[in-house]
């Protein structure tokens, strides 16, 4: 488990870009954090490191966006999904078992259908340390829940 501290969006992006160097085809990144914690900013940092040139936006209404770069990035937003079962989300397997990287915001909402071995990234705000302060915990062991 690795813990990072960020004091602004630029630092969050740099942390994500460094983290992206550890990803490989088939990696699944499960993001958790409150609204406005920086999940999309973290995703944008990963995408940038993987050669994506277009702007990354949260796919709240489409559920998944695809970005092509040196490696394909599938960016999910599971905010609107609740009480999912494997049958509800069997379409996700096409992404989870692809040659791209899956990054899932609000992953706890679909935790029941995530394949084993995903990487958990938790982003926490702490206003006592500043409005833009973030604690970013990356657990690559798969032991921490999203």
Protein language model annotation of sequence segments:
Residues 1-18:
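N-terminal pre-Walker A segment at the start of P-loop NTPase domains
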Residues 19-26:
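Phosphate-binding P-loop
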Residues 39:
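Conserved lysine of the Walker
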Residues 75-82:
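Switch II (G3) loop of P-loop NTPases
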Residues 29-31:
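Hydrophobic anchor at the beta1->P-loop junction of P-loop NTPases
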């Amino acid at each position: 488990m690795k813990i990072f501290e960020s004091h602004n969006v630029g630092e969050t992006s740099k942390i994500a870009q460094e983290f992206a160097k550890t990803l490989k085809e088939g990696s699944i990144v499960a993001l958790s954090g409150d609204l406005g914690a920086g999940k999309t900013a973290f995703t944008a940092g990963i995408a940038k490191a993987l050669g994506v040139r277009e702007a990354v936006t949260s796919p709240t209404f489409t559920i998944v966006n695809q970005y092509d770069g040196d490696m394909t990035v599938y960016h999910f937003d599971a905010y609107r999904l609740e009480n999912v079962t494997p049958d509800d989300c069997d379409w996700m397997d096409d992404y989870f078992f692809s040659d791209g990287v899956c990054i899932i915001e609000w992953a706890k909402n679909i935790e029941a259908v995530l394949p084993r071995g995903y990487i958990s990234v938790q982003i926490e705000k702490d206003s006592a340390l500043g409005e833009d302060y973030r604690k970013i915990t990356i657990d690559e062991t798969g032991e921490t829940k999203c």
